[in-house]
């Protein structure tokens, strides 16, 4: 399955972020 890169809009599909979490409608990377 495809997944979204960090910074991608995820408002409609919050579970598809690659190694990231959907926050404020955008994928935010969990690694800093």
UniProtKB/Swiss-Prot annotation:
On this chain, the residues bearing 4-hydroxyproline are 6, 14
Q: Which domain of life is it from?
A: Eukaryota
Question: Domain comment?
Answer: The presence of a 'disulfide through disulfide knot' structurally defines this protein as a knottin. The cysteine framework is VI/VII (C-C-CC-C-C).
Q: Which compartments does it reside in?
A: Secreted
Q: Between which residues do disulfide bridges form? A: 3-18, 10-22, 17-27
Q: Which UniProt keywords apply?
A: Disulfide bond, Hydroxylation, Ion channel impairing toxin, Knottin, Neurotoxin, Presynaptic neurotoxin, Secreted, Toxin, Voltage-gated sodium channel impairing toxin
What function does the entry list?
Delta-conotoxins bind to site 6 of voltage-gated sodium channels (Nav) and inhibit the inactivation process. This toxin acts on Nav1.4/SCN4A and Nav1.6/SCN8A (EC(50)=2.3 uM).
What does the record give as the organism's lineage?
Eukaryota, Metazoa, Spiralia, Lophotrochozoa, Mollusca
Its UniProt miscellaneous note says: Negative results: does not show activity on rNav1.2/SCN2A, rNav1.3/SCN3A, hNav1.5/SCN5A, Nav1.7/SCN9A, rNav1.8/SCN10A, Kv1.1/KCNA1, Kv1.3/KCNA3, Kv1.4/KCNA4, Kv1.5/KCNA5, hKv11.1/KCNH2/ERG1, shaker and DmNav1/para. Found in the dissected venom (DV), but not in the injectable (milked) venom (IV).
What the record says about family reads: Belongs to the conotoxin O1 superfamily.
UniProt-recorded name of the protein: Delta-conotoxin-like CnVIB
| Gene Ontology, cellular component aspect | extracellular region; host cell presynaptic membrane
**Where does the entry say this protein is expressed, by tissue?**
Expressed by the venom duct.
Give the Gene Ontology MF terms in alphabetical order: sodium channel regulator activity; toxin activity
Main localization category? secreted
> Does the keyword Disulfide bond belong to this entry?
yes
